[in-house]
Amino acid sequence: LQLKEDKIIGSYQHWDGYPSGLGYNLIDNWYRADKVEKAIMLGDASKWGQFIGEKIGFDNREADSYDYQNVYYGRDRGEKDCNHKVYTSEEAYLKNGFNSGEDYIYLGKMIGQKDYLGREQVTWFYAKYDMKKFEPLETVAIMDHIDDLKRHMKEQLKEVA
């Protein structure tokens, strides 16, 4: 997330970091800057859901909120050294944001986009490890998500036939 003073805060998210997965989740659920900042400040996560959530057993997949909330390495598993990172610029983020083997990194910016109530919201951008700059995320995430859904439906239809 790019903060007002242009520094960027970020954290690693392990599960399904592709535009059709995490990218789609970001544009669908993570458009309030205060919510995004709080989530990032909790550090590296196994997965991001629809909301931050409360401390939960890391492997407690039976918990009612497990499928919907974020699950963090520090808060939920007690790991150390998994705090958020601070980058001085987009260039620094592009250079150093792929240190955990990520294929994609994401950047939320406040560029004046508003929600239906007129409140400012985060606009998301992404970069693949071989890209030189961030590109708008929304169209790519939606199209990739649709492709994933089509593949899923094709598999379901094979099973029925």
Where are these regions (language model features)?
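Short, extreme N-terminal segment that most often corresponds to the first beta-strand
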Residues: 1-18, 22
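All-alpha amphipathic helical-bundle segments outside canonical DNA-binding/catalytic cores
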Residues: 25
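Low-complexity intrinsically disordered segments
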Residues: 28-161
